[in-house]
């Protein structure tokens, strides 16, 4: 009898397994509820679209303060999470997910997630870039040689290919039930977004046609000396405030900083002020160069992260 009962129990468990699998929650899929909007803001370009209706609304925004630099922000109640970091990836092209930081929006307090430096490139190309960066770190004082790429080999062209193939954005705010924004192909929207970034160059005093001919970008000589722990604003430290600041520097043909603009998604302007003040004073550069060695004005982007280390 004991053996018979044991076999019956195993069979019963096996029969219940499909029911448990079927109960696994499906992803929350949200369709667009607005068109893509490109916002030519004063110092940035934004690409914005809303998904879902009512309590399921999620707003997605891409933001760029310079060509080739892009952050991504998503906010809305469906993104509620207890995690401090949330991963996302573009489907069906994305492989390895990329992580973002969770924050709370003001004044509604809706969940918000910020992903910094979103590349929108294939994993193998990102790995290649990382390898080059790691090798450069071994020789931080050596300026990389000039690079000449065909139009189809440029990161811009490869990003456009990636964006065209991407049709969804998966956000793992709840690991057992991700939110999927059904974006459709991102190719046309990203192309319009990049045009805004190109148009912004003229507003900064940078010639877009000249910028496209640069084979050696601006080179920073001493970035490790720009900011230190001592530069953390004391009032912000006492308040426990943190921030991430994107610093955009205009560099003339002699390597001199002619303008500094600091931008942040955080509402703590003291971090912005400190970043520009210290970097403008301490930074040293070699200017951008054309193929014939002519030095030309260009720009340089630096991200400054203000974090309080845990005790």
Model regions and ranges:
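Positively charged n-region of N-terminal signal peptides that target proteins for export
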Residues: 1-9
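Hydrophobic h-region of N-terminal signal peptides that target proteins for export
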Residues: 9-24
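An ectodomain-focused feature that recognizes extracytoplasmic/extracellular
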Residues: 24-89
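Predominantly extracellular/secreted and cell-surface proteins with exposed
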Residues: 77-120
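Internal interaction segment
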Residues: 105-227
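Short proline/glycine- and basic residue-enriched helix-capping loop/turn segments at helix->loop/beta transitions
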Residues: 210-248, 273-311
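A short acidic/small-residue loop/turn micro-motif
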Residues: 234-235, 264-270
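Short, acidic, Ser/Thr-enriched surface-loop or helix-capping motifs
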Residues: 252, 257, 290
